[in-house]
UniProtKB/Swiss-Prot annotation:
Quaternary structure and partners: Part of the 50S ribosomal subunit. Contacts protein L32.
Disulfide bonds: none
Alphabetical keyword list: Ribonucleoprotein, Ribosomal protein
Official protein name in the record: Large ribosomal subunit protein bL17
Domain of life from the UniProt record: Bacteria
InterPro entries linked: Ribosomal_bL17, Ribosomal_bL17_CS, Ribosomal_bL17_sf
Gene Ontology terms describing biological process: translation
GO cellular component, one term: cytosolic large ribosomal subunit
GO molecular function, one term: structural constituent of ribosome
Gene expressing this chain: rplQ
Amino acid sequence: MARKLGRKTDSRMALLRNLASDLIIHERIETTEAKAKELRSIVEKMITLGKRGDLHARRQAAAFLYNKETDEDNNVIQKLFDDVAARYEDRQGGYTRVLKLNERQGDGAKMAIIELV
């Protein structure tokens, strides 16, 4: 892991799991630039697992992502394997885009939007 994000390991992994789950659900989130860049590699790996589509890949993704509800019928794992992976079936990597924004007014942190392409 390249960036520590000012947190200890457990807190950092919980943050990234939460952000990865939210990105898969909403397909676009606004966060700091460092978090977005760190999140990019994790989400790319999750989408690659989704494209593989076998039981072991599903269990690996379920072990990392939080089991959040996307709507009444689906959760984040179902959305990853059914919707998101199918969309990128012909694409070899590069599933996310990081767009830089202005600094946050309160503390001047560099902000960015990370979204699924």
